[in-house]
């Protein structure tokens, strides 16, 4: 797991606004991302892809500003472009083209001269595990191989930062773990990464910081590395009886954080000073039966649920989970 260590912020957002066809898509994004690997989360339509496209210069900024590695995306486009590598979610290869030719072409488009671009194409394809298949046509590749080829073209020119859009999408467990291992290795080499994914487990396994978008706004920014070091426990409770909402309110008054789910289920973040017996005692006082209590597998799941409940209306939750 990587830890944030660079003095230069990965991304600084200051009221960033983007309108497409007159419709607001990004609505005043503000926040500082300093991690080595930052997870970008949000439901469909939250603005994740629009944010990537804006950072890459595909969409103009309508208001506010954004700085990537200290470079203003509106005024430093030429100096910023060689610093970024982009792995899109959708297929981006050219049918009939070999992997090495494709990666070489992308490296040239990123600014490398032809000869160094070819050398880096071979290196990148060997690095991701496609060395033996580098002369094969991309349209004969499996889905997992195509994903690796997209990663190779993103790193071939030696960027300082990667934007990865759903890099494990559609992969089987083995290929998924291979991709995540590569992401961690790349980050450990000093390359900064923003990883957009709908798979919370992938984000939790790779990222030291996370930003969650909702309805084009920042719902929360959290330090996952600090959360891993904390002693808080994450529980899931199945309850029956009692006045609706009384038990969650009592837990909040105790210092817990609570997300209410369907069918009277609760996700609860319990501080170190509170023991499980106290949860049962308060349930009894509220006339609530705790029918099941189990440890939750994911602290990030709590964060995401809380952000979806409370974020996105102009207020930003930066308190973690």
Task: Show the residue positions of the predicted features.
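Walker A (P-loop) phosphate-binding loop of ABC-type ATPase nucleotide-binding domains
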Residues: 43-47
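Catalytic Walker B motif of ABC-type/P-loop ATPase nucleotide-binding domains
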Residues: 162-166
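Conserved ABC transporter NBD signature motif
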Residues: 64-75, 79-80
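ABC transporter nucleotide-binding domain
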Residues: 178-269
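Helix-to-loop junction immediately C-terminal to a conserved catalytic motif
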Residues: 56
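Conserved ABC ATPase "signature" region
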Residues: 104, 108, 115-133
């Amino acid at each position: 797991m990587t830890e944030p260590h660079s003095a230069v912020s990965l991304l600084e957002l200051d009221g960033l606004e983007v309108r497409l066809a007159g419709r607001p898509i990004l609505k005043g994004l503000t926040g500082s991302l300093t991690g080595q690997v930052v997870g970008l989360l949000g439901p469909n339509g939250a603005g994740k892809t629009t944010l990537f496209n804006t950072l890459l210069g595909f969409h103009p900024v309508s208001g506010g500003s954004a700085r990537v590695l200290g470079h203003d995306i509106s005024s430093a486009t030429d100096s910023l472009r060689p610093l970024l590598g982009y792995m899109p979610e959708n297929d981006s290869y050219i049918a009939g083209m070999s992997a090495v030719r494709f990666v070489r072409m992308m490296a040239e488009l990123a600014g490398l001269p032809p000869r160094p671009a070819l050398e880096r194409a071979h290196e990148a394809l060997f690095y991701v595990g496609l060395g033996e298949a580098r002369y094969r046509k991309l349209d004969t590749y499996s889905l997992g191989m195509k994903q690796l080829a997209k990663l190779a073209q993103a790193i071939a020119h030696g960027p300082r930062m990667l934007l990865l859009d759903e890099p494990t999408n559609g992969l089987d467990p083995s290929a998924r773990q291979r991709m995540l291992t590569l992401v961690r290795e790349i980050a450990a080499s000093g390359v900064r990464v923003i990883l957009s994914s709908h798979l919370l487990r992938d984000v939790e396994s790779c990222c030291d910081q996370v930003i969650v978008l909702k309805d084009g706004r920042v719902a929360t920014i959290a330090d996952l590395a600090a959360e891993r070091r904390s002693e808080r426990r994450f529980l899931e409770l199945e309850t029956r009886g009692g006045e609706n909402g009384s038990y969650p309110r009592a837990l909040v008054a105790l210092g817990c954080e609570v997300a209410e789910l369907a069918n009277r289920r609760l996700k609860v973040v319990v501080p170190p000073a509170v023991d499980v017996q106290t949860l049962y005692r308060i349930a009894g006082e509220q006339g609530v039966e705790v029918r099941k209590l189990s440890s939750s597998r994911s602290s990030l799941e709590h964060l995401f649920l809380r952000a979806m409940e409370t974020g996105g209306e102009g207020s930003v939750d930066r308190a973690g989970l």
